[in-house]
């Protein structure tokens, strides 16, 4: 990969001394509200969301190479990162329009790459829903949108992390067997599209190419892929892009995510780290809502630390430096 000196220095800040990105993701907004709402009757407040993000930043960034936050509720937390941790800021609005299958991208209207950089970001992250087999007119809109963000990041000389969430316009349940069958094609082909230089992307944040719950030996439901088939998809994923790529945890358990990383490595995926969110911190939400700040801190110092420490050990054994791509 070719990086300007400025972008390279930001990438160094976001990764550890071995060039591995062990980033903590807490840019959840809608998903966080829904999690909190499970444990209280009233609507979660802005103050609650901001405070929990601060707690997670204070307690867990000493063990992460960087943290991803949103500029809506995450700016207080951005001031509480460990001194060695880098900062990624999300540029997209949360969620998507559920009345349509288009899932068009949308920036936070009062933000720009320039403003995110001024706020202290070491990288701009943008989430895109993409169906490679979807409406061509819609996909051209999405590609043009990403080109614009790439140009912004190039102008500001700041790394651009594109998070791709693949989907199928005709399948409503992403957890279904039906979608599991087409997921490898959806994930891999979307990666190929956005590896084109014209998008100006520096790192791809991607899903693993299969739903591990339907892989032989990993789940207790129906089997969609044998382990050999799944391994082949991981190998294909590594060949799908010349760019550094990191895995998102997609809300799965810490254990399944760690097992998946080991499987990925054994299959020949030379991934460059993770942006791991709920698998690390989700358990703190219940304690925070029901018992308060001290209980949430205690959970983060014990269970949260255990999650991130185990993940770091797995990463050390499985991930490779982004400098090698």
From Swiss-Prot:
* One Pfam family this sequence matches: DeoC
List the InterPro entries: Aldolase_TIM, DeoC/FbaB/LacD_aldolase, LacD_aldolase, Tag_1.6-dipho_adolase
Q: In which pathway does it act?
A: Carbohydrate metabolism; D-tagatose 6-phosphate degradation; D-glyceraldehyde 3-phosphate and glycerone phosphate from D-tagatose 6-phosphate: step 2/2
Report the SUPFAM superfamilies cross-referenced here. Answer: Aldolase (SSF51569)
Which regions form coiled coils? none
The record's annotation in Gene3D superfamilies points to:
Aldolase class I (3.20.20.70)
- Keywords per UniProt: Lactose metabolism, Lyase
The answer to keyword Lyase applying to this record is yes
Which leading EC class covers this enzyme? lyase
Mind listing the GO biological process terms from this record?
Answer: 6-sulfoquinovose(1-) catabolic process; D-tagatose 6-phosphate catabolic process; lactose catabolic process via tagatose-6-phosphate
Q: Which residues cross the membrane?
A: none
A Gene Ontology molecular function term for this protein is: tagatose-6-phosphate kinase activity
Q: Mind telling me what this protein is named?
A: Tagatose 1,6-diphosphate aldolase 1
Organismal lineage: Bacteria, Bacillati, Bacillota, Bacilli, Lactobacillales
Gene giving rise to this polypeptide: lacD1
């Amino acid at each position: 990969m070719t990086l300007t000196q400025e972008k390279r220095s930001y990438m160094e800040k976001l990764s550890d001394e071995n060039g591995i990105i062990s980033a903590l993701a807490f840019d959840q907004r809608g998903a966080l509200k829904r999690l909190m709402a499970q444990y209280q009757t009233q609507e979660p407040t802005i103050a609650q969301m901001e405070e929990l993000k601060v707690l997670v930043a204070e307690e867990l960034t000493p063990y992460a190479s960087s943290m991803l936050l949103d500029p809506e509720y995450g700016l207080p937390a951005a001031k509480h990162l460990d001194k060695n941790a880098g900062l990624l800021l999300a540029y997209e609005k949360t969620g998507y329009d559920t009345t349509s299958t288009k899932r068009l991208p949308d920036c936070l209207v009062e933000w720009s790459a320039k403003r995110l950089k001024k706020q202290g970001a070491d990288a701009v992250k943008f989430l895109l829903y993409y169906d490679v087999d979807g409406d061509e007119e819609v996909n051209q809109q999405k590609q043009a949108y990403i080109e614009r963000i790439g140009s912004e990041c190039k102008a500001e000389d700041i790394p651009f992390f594109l998070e791709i969430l693949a989907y199928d316009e005709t399948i409503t349940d992403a957890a279904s067997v039906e979608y599991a069958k087409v997921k490898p094609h959806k994930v891999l082909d979307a990666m190929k599209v956005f590896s084109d230089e014209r998008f100006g992307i520096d790192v791809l944040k991607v899903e693993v190419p299969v739903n591990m719950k339907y892989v032989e030996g990993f789940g207790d439901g129906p089997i969609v892929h044998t382990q050999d088939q799944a391994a082949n998809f991981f190998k294909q994923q590594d060949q799908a892009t010349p760019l550094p790529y990191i895995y998102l945890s997609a809300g799965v358990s810490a254990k399944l995510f760690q097992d998946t990383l080991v499987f990925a490595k054994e299959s020949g995926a030379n991934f460059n780290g993770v942006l791991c969110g709920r698998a690390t911190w989700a358990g703190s939400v219940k304690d925070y809502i029901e018992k308060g700040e001290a209980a949430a801190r205690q959970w983060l110092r014990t269970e949260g630390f255990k999650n991130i420490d185990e993940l770091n050990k797995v990463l050390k054994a499985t991930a490779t430096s982004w400098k090698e791509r």
